[in-house]
Amino acid sequence: MQAIILDTETHSLNGLPIEIAYAPIQIQAGKLTLDKSQIFDQLYSIGDEKISYGAMAVHHILEQDIVDQPHFDTFQLPSETFYIIGHNIDYDIRTIEKCGVDSSKIKAICTLALARRAWPDAEAHNISALIYMISK
């Protein structure tokens, strides 16, 4: 089984990807393993598009950070990726589809949906709030 934990950053809400990161994981006999040498994290250029100030405030990626980076449409998923895991993962999948990725055979596992189900009364379900809540 090939699964990745995926996160993207975009130039605006529902925009083009300017950073794509993933960590391939293996799950065997109920144990999750991660080979840190296989972690992928790449900034991408978006042509003449400008990064919105709202997006900059979220991810702190500035326009000068993506100068001379590969164009976003060069991104490819690792071969034989069957599962993509992430927080609000549908957003990230829509983002990588803008790179030309075919996600039709990929199964999404949304940690936001899982968190809402596990802790329905939590004050917030974003990753930062969950970390504080779980680590109490």
Residue ranges and their predicted role:
Residues 1-107, 120-136:
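Conserved non-catalytic scaffold segment of RNase H-like nuclease domains
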Residues 112-121:
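Short, flexible loop segments at boundaries between secondary-structure elements
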